Amino acid sequence: MAESQSQGADQAQDLNNELKTRREKLVALRETGIAFPNDFRRDSTSDRLHAEFDGKENEELEELGVEVTVAGRMMTRRIMGKASFVTLQDVGGRIQLYVSRDDLAEGIYNEQFKKWDLGDILGARGKLFKTKTGELSIHCTELRLLTKALRPLPDKFHGLADQETRYRQRYLDLIANDESRNTFRIRSKVMAAIRSFMVDHGFMEVETPMMQVIPGGASARPFITHHNALDIDMYLRIAPELYLKRLVVGGFERVFEINRNFRNEGVSPRHNPEFTMMELYMAYADYKDLIVLTENLFRTLTQDVLGSTTVEYGDQTFDFGKPFEKLTMREAICKYRPETNVADLDDLEKATAIAQSLGIKIEKSWGLGRIVTEIFEETAESSLIQPTFITEYPAEVSPLARRNDQNPEITDRFEFFIGGREIGNGFSELNDAEDQAERFAQQVNAKDAGDDEAMFYDEDYVTALEHGLPPTAGLGIGIDRMVMLFTNSHTIRDVILFPAMRPQK
């Protein structure tokens, strides 16, 4: 223990000494008037250079005489007397620089370059060549310091093994970890591919309020804020659903939105209070049309983003090339709890007994539909590994979904699961204003009974429905969970650039 404390003290002292030295170097740079120049322009990035020239031999490069200008962060440096090799990292990756004293302006190599530190941002100009080992490199004829880094690279002393540091100081994580940079590149590609798919299918992207007088569109506990000018409390939105459906009433028949939602709930590997959703609404369609659309969307995304219809996640392989499985909620319960008699799920007393045998704590306000849903979540949800649609959700847990014509106790709704996780939720929308008003009233009763996730009564939305909502289907997909899947990430914090964290003391 004492030895560990001593090592920690030594590391802290080393770091303090390095910080002091770097600041002294900055003072000298300021005296020259070139501390932070802004007149250097690059014409190439490392990924483009590798893509175009990795396949060429050194003789070809010499014949071509390709001169390039690059800029980036100095990650490594090997000084060998009058010459050095530098690894430069930019947005596209890394490329090697060959720096020779005799090829630079007088004094640059010894008086400047050797005094620069790892982490400094450099600009370089020179001709491409390949080393004896075949590595594409730049033979520098010009080298400039563009930004002085006052702190060392994160791995020099204690690295970024601490996950909390990776999340709190994401910029360090991105500098040090190729995997993290790739994760967020894939996230960007996913967002772009979704937008392209939606536009190709005739949808219009819109934006709806992030602050709402009445939070709606989902069952969740909202964040509360205060609007000073209006002197009213407002809520960060838990979902955009009710505003998007107002737009369908107004005549925009296919709309979608990609944006953040906020839910004042717990943090877990699958939950962050601020998260990204894509919601879409399509007039003159039902939930079956959405199932087809969802299947096509995921098949297209995997192909466009990953170049394959199969996704590796941990020790599992998900196949998006095959037709997705479709089960009703009751079928799923019976499949993964074979001893269940399906008829018992239609009997309140027997369903209650099943739930209690599973250790489910039943609230007094729960009806049969909520109990069956809890049984499903306990027995089947984690077993839905391959892409699966679960249908026939009870009306009790689906306050915004249209009732099924043959059985009004269930709704025309589905949830989409991959790897035991819910990824999407869609349904035929309830467009009966009187039925919606009644369900809002039931939600208010549940809230009065202590359910702080129950919905508020949104009178303006009911008024919108009274003007006529066409037959409509709506879908919500969790972007963060989708990116987790595509990047083999096992916690949501790994796919959110700046996840919610408790402030450091």
Curated annotation (Swiss-Prot):
Binding site for Mg(2+) 1: 415, 422
HAMAP family listed in its UniProt record: Lys_tRNA_synth_class2
GO cellular component entries: cytosol
Keyword tRNA-binding: no
Subunit and partners: Homodimer.
Enzyme Commission designation: 6.1.1.6
Taxonomic placement: Bacteria, Pseudomonadati, Pseudomonadota, Gammaproteobacteria, Enterobacterales
SUPFAM superfamilies to which the protein is assigned, alphabetical: Class II aaRS and biotin synthetases, Nucleic acid-binding proteins
Biological process (GO), any one: lysyl-tRNA aminoacylation
Keywords carried by this UniProt record: Aminoacyl-tRNA synthetase, ATP-binding, Cytoplasm, Ligase, Magnesium, Metal-binding, Nucleotide-binding, Protein biosynthesis
Binding, Mg(2+) 2: 422
Gene Ontology terms for molecular function: ATP binding; lysine-tRNA ligase activity; magnesium ion binding; tRNA binding
Reaction equations catalysed: tRNA(Lys) + L-lysine + ATP = L-lysyl-tRNA(Lys) + AMP + diphosphate
Cofactor annotation comment: Binds 3 Mg(2+) ions per subunit.
PROSITE patterns assigned: AA_TRNA_LIGASE_II
Subcellular location: Cytoplasm
Source organism (scientific name): Pectobacterium carotovorum subsp. carotovorum (strain PC1)
Family label: Belongs to the class-II aminoacyl-tRNA synthetase family.
Name of the protein this chain belongs to: Lysine--tRNA ligase
UniProt-listed NCBIfam families: lysS_bact (TIGR00499), PRK00484.1 (NF001756), PRK12445.1 (NF009101)
Keyword field contains Acyltransferase: no
Cofactor section: Mg(2+)
